[in-house]
Amino acid sequence: MTVLHSVDFFPSGKAPVAIEPRLPQAAFPEHHHDFHEIVIVEHGTGIHVFNGQPYTISGGTVCFVRDHDRHLYEHTDNLCLTNVLWRSPDAFQFLAGLDQLLPQEQDGYYPSHWRVNQSVLQQVRQLVGLMERTGDGMDAPAVANREILFMQLLVLLRRSSLMEGATNNDAKLNQLMAWLEDHFAEEVCWEAVAEQFSLSLRTLHRQLKQHTGLTPQRYLNRLRLIKARHLLRHSDHSVTEIAYRCGFGDSNHFSTLFRREFNWSPRDIRQGRDAIIQ
């Protein structure tokens, strides 16, 4: 597995924060690093496989990667990221208590992926721009200024994330997308889902298409197929059982959609043929 080292990304041996844009981010194999990372998705879509679990990401997704997490990107479509790298909590001279603003693992669950709306994303861009323009000076005022901006970024993300529960249409869509991540295998009635999240059906269709480039049903199908591919690789369930577990009522229809999406059959994935080619 590829290991990325801080010496290759940080401007100096003491700098606690670095900005690394990926415009766009191509598919990238599984890796980990000796630093922490906040991944901010500007726009586009892709699959983020985080510690073996696949997540669909799009504009407004924010992912918190720790120094022991492993992840990769695949199935990317104009995926543009800004990565805010930071060494460790004890690398800061003026900041303490950062863990109170970061997602925390509880009972084995780590809420690594948050979502923010487009207006917050614009504020994030402005803060990151300020961080890039502060320069590499290591005198106390310059270091303090960079650390203050990093703290402001964490506060903005914390306040604006799904966890804080906003009420505008962007936030409602974020909540809906998070709900689909957990309920993808259920029969979904879009009229009922729209009502559940206080959105009109027309707004749901328009906003999901703007965020992901996909209609609601195509987005749901892709989500199901991604989950199915994960089970094909990491479980012993039969193809038919996996199809049903992931919300498909017909295994033949599942196989047709799967091949159309990934250019491999479910059996190919089960036998690891895609990995052999790569």
Swiss-Prot record:
One of its GO terms (biological process) is rhamnose metabolic process. One of its GO terms (molecular function) is DNA-binding transcription factor activity. The keyword DNA-binding applies. It is found in: Cytoplasm. One of its GO terms (cellular component) is cytoplasm. The record marks E241, D250 as: Interaction with sigma-70. Residues 191-212, 239-262 bind DNA. It comes from the Bacteria. Residues 174-272 form the HTH araC/xylS-type domain. The keyword Flavoprotein does not apply. This is HTH-type transcriptional activator RhaS.
